[in-house]
Amino acid sequence: MGSTFRDRTVELHSLSQTLKKIGAIPSVHQDEDDPASSKRSSPGSEFNKKASRIGLGIKETSQKITRLAKLAKQSTIFNDRTVEIQELTVLIRNDITGLNMALSDLQTLQNMELADGNYSQDQVGHYTAVCDDLKTRLMGATKQLQDVLTTRSENMKAHENRKQLFSTKNAVDSPPQNNAKSVPEPPPWSSSSNPFGNLQQPLLPPLNTGAPPGSQLRRRSAIENAPSQQMEMSLLQQTVPKQENYSQSRAVALHSVESRITELSGIFPQLATMVTQQGELAIRIDDNMDESLVNVEGARSALLQHLTRISSNRWLMMKIFAVIILFLIVFLFFVA
C-alpha cells in the first residue's frame, strides 16, 4: 500500500526564494542593523530592559544567598567551609553593590524620561510601581544576607567558645594524669616471677654501694620515665601551633563576616533614601492627578453651561437656520 503523503519541500524552498527576490519577505536582521529603527523604538523600551535585567540579577542573588545559608547551616567545627563561604559572601556583596548602582541609574533614567512630560499617568504609575518593587526585592535580599551572616557569626562564636571550653577542661585534667604516670613502678628485676633476675643483677654496676636499695630504685624509675615525659612535651609542642593557626583562621573569618555585616548596614540607608524619594514622587503624582481631575470637572461644568445657554437662545437658532437657507438659495439659483 503506497504512501498518501507527498514531499513538497522543494516547492516550499522555491516559493521562499521567489518571495525573497520580489521583496515580499523582509530581511530578518534589517531592523537590527538599521540605527534609525532602533531610534524609533518605544521610549520605555530601555527602561523595561534595564528593569528586567535588574530583576533577573536580584533573583540570581537570592539563589546565591540561599546557597550561602545552606553552607552556613551545614558547617560544623569538624567540617568548616570557610574559604567557600568567604568567596560566596564577597560575590554576593559585589552583586548587591552592582544592583544598587543599577537601580540608582534606573531611577535617574526614570526621572529624565518623566521630565520630558510625554507620558501618561498610567505610564508614570507603571514606572513607579516597577521601581518600588525592585527596591523592595533588593532590600529583602540584603536583609536576608545580613541575617545569614549574623547567623554565621553566632555559630562561629559558639564553636570558638565550645573549643575553648574543651581545651580548658583538658588542661585542667592533664596534671593528675602526669602525676599518675610519674609514680615509680617496681622494676622487672624486683619481681620474683622474673627467672633472669639473678643474671641481670650482676651486670648492673652499683651506683652507690653505701646507698639504700630504695634510692637506687627511685633513680632507675626516674630514668625510665624521662623519655615518656619528653615525648609528651614534643607532642604538646606540635599540637599547640596547629591550634593557634586554627584559632587565627577562625578569628580572621569572624572579622570578615562582621565587616560584611557592617558594609550591608551601610547599604540600607541608601535604599531607604531611594524609597523615600520614590514615595515623594508618588505623592506628587497623586497631587497632579487631583489637580487634573479638578480641571476636568471645571471644563465639563463650563461646557454644560455653554450648552444650556445655546439651547435656551432661540433667536440664535433662528439666525443659524436663516444663514443655512440663504446659502441654499444662493447655491441653487446662482451656482447651479
Curated annotation (Swiss-Prot):
GO terms for biological process: intracellular protein transport; vesicle-mediated transport. Keywords: Coiled coil, Cytoplasm, Endosome, Golgi apparatus, Membrane, Protein transport, Transmembrane, Transmembrane helix, Transport. Residues 244-306 form the t-SNARE coiled-coil homology domain. It is found in: Golgi apparatus, cis-Golgi network membrane; Cytoplasm; Endosome. Part of the t-SNARE complex. Interacts with CDC48A, but not with VPS45. It comes from Arabidopsis thaliana. It is a single-pass type IV membrane protein. Residues 164-181 have a biased composition (Polar residues). This is Syntaxin-31.
